[in-house]
Amino acid sequence: DKSYSLLLKILKEEYHKKPSGSKIKNPLEYILQLTEALQIKEIDATIIVFFIKQQGMDLFNQQNVKGWDGGKSWLTSQLYLQRNNVSDLLCNGRNINRKTFKNLPENGEELKISLEKIDIRINFNPKGTNKQIIKELSDAYLFQIDENIQKDKEAILKYDFDASSKNSQQAVVRLFNFITKSPEFQLI
């Protein structure tokens, strides 16, 4: 009975620090979350493998028995920029391919290759107000929200937003794109 109570104590009280928000998404988690949220069905698995390899996660060539370094190595400034560019492409309904990664624009230049158009959608409450939809997406995809980011999101999805209008999907996708570019989206 003593060992049982000790084991119970260890399992219930072992670690007081909350682990959420302390880990950076690895490239696979990142791209799969994007494709799932945007409900992309026709993305080529080899493109996902190529993307995560470009991000430093070669699935079939781990650095050692332990696996990948993880942690902060998943998010250098170059990898963060590449993630933002991929998010832009997908949120604009453009499929990614190998040429995309070789020709990613720098410093706001236009992308010079033609990309296949894909259908994207974000699930949201069609009867919700702008603040309800912002909260819904923030709760689903962000670890924490600060006041400045909240104001920026409210500038994207304005107070007079009508969730039942025909352009509501594009507005919510713009909001999602903004969310994906925030540092908080990179955290688990």
What are the roles of these predicted feature ranges?
Residues 1-188:
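Flexible, low-complexity segments enriched for small/polar residues
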